[in-house]
Amino acid sequence: MAETKYEPRLKAEYVSRIRQALREQFSYANEMQIPKLDKIVINMGVGEATADSKKPTVAAADLAAIAGQKPVITRARNSIAGFKVREDMPIGAKVTLRGARMYEFMDRLINIALPRVRDFRGLNPKSFDGRGNFAMGIKEHIVFPEINYDKVDQMWGMDIIVCTTAPTDDEARALLKEFNFPFRQ
């Protein structure tokens, strides 16, 4: 019996349609020059961690449900007296997605989570870093379908960074537009 290998919907779309569209738009000489997604990093900073050291663990559990992968607890690199933060204190969680999980997360982000954001008018097209990476923030993590709204005691925001192999922002913007990222006009 032949096994059928699972391929995420967006990856199949990238291989079949998006690569060719980018190749025609930017007239690349080499197949390897065509930009692709490298990774997606999701970071959750928990400001209340100074008062309650269990908060980053709860945030990490929510992040694991959203990403489908166990996050790493981030710790403070140095002490900051003004914020009551001590060195090596847990202050958040982050996860790096690659491969199939990255495409599946991006599919849920574009088609489910972003439309559920209150007063959403589109992503800022200027949020690129100059090297082809796109960063965005979400104020409430409950926009993801994996989070049960009734069981949430506190809402956290998160940073989502989409890293691409594109050398310029214009090429990365074209790649993400092909993936149907809802950029502001």
Swiss-Prot record:
One of its GO terms (biological process) is translation. The gene is rplE. GO terms for molecular function: rRNA binding; structural constituent of ribosome; tRNA binding. This is one of the proteins that bind and probably mediate the attachment of the 5S RNA into the large ribosomal subunit, where it forms part of the central protuberance. In the 70S ribosome it contacts protein S13 of the 30S subunit (bridge B1b), connecting the 2 subunits; this bridge is implicated in subunit movement. Contacts the P site tRNA; the 5S rRNA and some of its associated proteins might help stabilize positioning of ribosome-bound tRNAs. One of its GO terms (cellular component) is ribosome. Pfam families: Ribosomal_L5, Ribosomal_L5_C. Keywords: Ribonucleoprotein, Ribosomal protein, RNA-binding, rRNA-binding, tRNA-binding. The keyword Manganese does not apply. This is Large ribosomal subunit protein uL5. NCBIfam families: PRK00010.1. It comes from the Bacteria. The keyword RNA-binding applies. PROSITE patterns: RIBOSOMAL_L5.
